[in-house]
């Protein structure tokens, strides 16, 4: 069964009788009346087998169109359905059976409704042929730990929950200096003045059930400190000892350092032994005579992101994290932030800049993978 992906459309061109079938990114040309008739049926969402059964259909022309669309990854060729993590399988199967008998399960309908916008992203991942369902479903199995005390960390937490990463959590040491909700938290993930003074950690956990795309297990401890995250995300200035520990224990991590003036940064995403590390970044900056670490002049004012920039940075970071895990599911290595730092100017958010970091020959991380082999 082959069917076009949701979002593929038939476009007119300036040349009479000529059309484009696809998206603004990828498309095929339709230049005859016979092809147009077939393209209209395909654009309606009908499968190849359904159209083949129509009398008088040119099978060769139809196969040609589907083959061209498939080559551009504009076709879904596998049927799939949303699944929740293994601990819920029996519950969901029971709900599905009830729905077949005419019962309406509000929770299942809500999951399907909330998942549709997320599928508008995951179905277009390179190599996906099932409408993006497998990639979206797999997100709930990944453990992500966020550390940091700024707005970006808080917004990122909510975005990941809403995008299917049910197991995202804050590190135990997060908000140690600011355990209560304060004035700076107002407006972030629905926090209002009435929440000031409440426990930030407890508030975020109370939102987990409300924000999580997938259902949660009441018996599961999502704050289990003994479980090792698949990705650590640190927002703010980093501790060299902690980075060294993550490197030596082969823990993947993403850094979102504090902004410098009106310039924010995201990255790099470090895969120990397989990608450039933080020392590579410092050595490359030194070789290029760029500014490196700022001087420690004692007590300094804590710099918080403005709201607009905080949401922008958090959204970009969430996109990079989703790409990191979705790429693993599809066995491609297109992780965007590996070996890259993205800088964002508050005055021109629409023009972020990517800085590629190569592995530096003087950094020992290049030899870690060799020693592991």
Where in this protein do the model-derived segments appear?
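Adenine nucleotide-associated cytosolic modules
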Residues: 1-373
């Amino acid at each position: 069964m082959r069917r076009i992906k949701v979002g593929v459309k038939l476009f007119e061109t300036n040349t009479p009788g000529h059309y484009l079938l696809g998206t603004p990114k990828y498309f095929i040309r339709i230049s005859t009346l016979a092809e147009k008739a077939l393209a209209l049926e395909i654009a309606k969402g009908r499968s190849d087998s359904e159209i083949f059964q129509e009398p008088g259909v040119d099978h060769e022309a139809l196969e040609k169109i589907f083959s061209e669309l498939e080559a551009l990854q504009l076709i879904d060729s596998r049927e799939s359905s949303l699944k929740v993590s293994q601990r819920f399988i029996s519950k969901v199967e029971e709900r599905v059976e009830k729905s077949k008998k005419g019962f309406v399960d509000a929770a299942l309908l809500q999951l399907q409704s909330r998942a549709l916008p997320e599928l508008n992203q995951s179905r277009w991942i390179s190599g996906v042929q099932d409408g993006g369902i497998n990639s979206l479903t797999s997100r709930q199995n990944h453990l992500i730990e966020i550390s940091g005390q700024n707005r970006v960390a808080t917004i990122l937490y909510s975005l990941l929950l809403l995008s299917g990463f049910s197991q995202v959590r804050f590190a135990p040491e997060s908000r140690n200096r600011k355990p209560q909700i304060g004035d700076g938290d107002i407006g972030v993930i629905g926090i209002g003045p009435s929440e000031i003074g409440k426990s930030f950690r407890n508030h975020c956990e109370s939102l987990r059930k409300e924000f999580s795309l997938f259902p949660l297990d009441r018996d599961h401890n999502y704050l289990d400190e003994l479980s090792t995250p698949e990705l650590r995300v640190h927002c703010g200035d980093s501790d060299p000892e902690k980075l060294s520990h993550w490197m030596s224990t082969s823990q993947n991590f993403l850094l979102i350092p504090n902004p410098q003036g009106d310039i924010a940064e995201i990255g790099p995403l470090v895969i120990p032994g397989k990608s450039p590390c933080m020392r590579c970044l410092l050595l490359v900056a030194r070789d290029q005579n760029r500014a490196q670490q700022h001087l420690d002049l004692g007590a300094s004012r804590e710099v918080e992101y403005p709201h607009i920039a905080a949401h922008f940075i958090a959204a970009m970071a969430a996109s990079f994290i989703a790409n990191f895990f979705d790429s693993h599911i599809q066995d491609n290595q297109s992780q965007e932030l590996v070996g890259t730092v993205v800088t964002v100017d508050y005055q021109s958010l629409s023009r972020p800049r990517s800085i590629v970091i190569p592995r530096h020959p003087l950094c020992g991380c290049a030899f870690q993978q060799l020693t592991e082999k």
